[in-house]
Amino acid sequence: MSWFNRVKPSISSTAKRDVPEGLWWKCEECGAALHKKQMEASDHTCPQCGYHFRISPYKYFSLLFDNQKYVEFDDHLRAADPLHFVDTKKYPDRVSDTIEKSGKTEACRNAHGLCGGETLVISAMDFSFIGGSMGSVVGEKISRAVDKAIELQSPLLVISQSGGARMMEGAFSLMQMAKTAAKLSLLSEHRLPYISLMTDPTMGGITASFAMLGDINISEPKALIGFAGPRVIRDTIKRDLPEGFQRAEFLLEHGFIDRIIPRRELKSDLTTLLSLMKL
């Protein structure tokens, strides 16, 4: 009965390779699988459908500043907890956890350098840090970016990428809307241009304050731009919304923004704008 006890050889299988995390991306628009090198070559846009992935302030700095050289400033500012706010966790703990996980210190970064040979100050927001929400630090950083632009006698570019005001700071957060709007008026007094670039998403108190106050308001393709979200509006008015409502293309058609610029054309178009504004 030796044949009965004979063990059949198992099917051989190839050992699985460990794929490094972040090597492959999936396009949220068309589902295409994109290699990291493809993403970097296309400035984190989908080569198939043109979808724009969210990128960090550092990537915008590298994209826009000549030779990727720039000077960051006011990185030492940190959020306080004046309301001792607690939801599922204490606000300071939430900020600390976000800093630890992301390696970022706030939802906004400031830098200055040369863009097309012209001095430019950039204040860029980061959705990955608590939804890019605007608290007292973000408001202060944008205000200081205005001061730096006046000091250098240069234009200011603010790149918005935010869900709105930071609820954990309550009225202190809402105060930043008035603060940033008032501060931007100083640029007009000094005859310095302010360019607002809205990326996906630009919502809530950001749209209601500095994002729509640019001398020139531009946007990346298909960016969600508005105050309340489409679902909230639909549920409130009990009506279906037009197709593409609150997308950049809809806003351009209705005169709310001046131009839509694909990310790969942003540096060249911005250089042209800066040279024209200098005349």
Swiss-Prot record:
Name of protein: Acetyl-coenzyme A carboxylase carboxyl transferase subunit beta
Class of the enzyme per the UniProt entry, highest EC level: transferase
Co-factor(s): Zn(2+)
Compartments in which it is found: Cytoplasm
SUPFAM superfamilies xrefs: ClpP/crotonase
Positions contributing to Zn(2+) binding: 27, 30, 46, 49
Zinc finger (C4-type): 27-49
Taxonomic placement: Bacteria, Pseudomonadati, Chlorobiota, Chlorobiia, Chlorobiales
PROSITE patterns membership: COA_CT_NTER
Keyword Transmembrane found: no
Gene Ontology biological process terms in this record: fatty acid biosynthetic process; malonyl-CoA biosynthetic process
E.C. code: 2.1.3.15
UniProt xrefs under Pfam families: Carboxyl_trans, Zn_ribbon_ACC
UniProt catalytic activity: N(6)-carboxybiotinyl-L-lysyl-[protein] + acetyl-CoA = N(6)-biotinyl-L-lysyl-[protein] + malonyl-CoA
Domain CoA carboxyltransferase N-terminal: 23-279
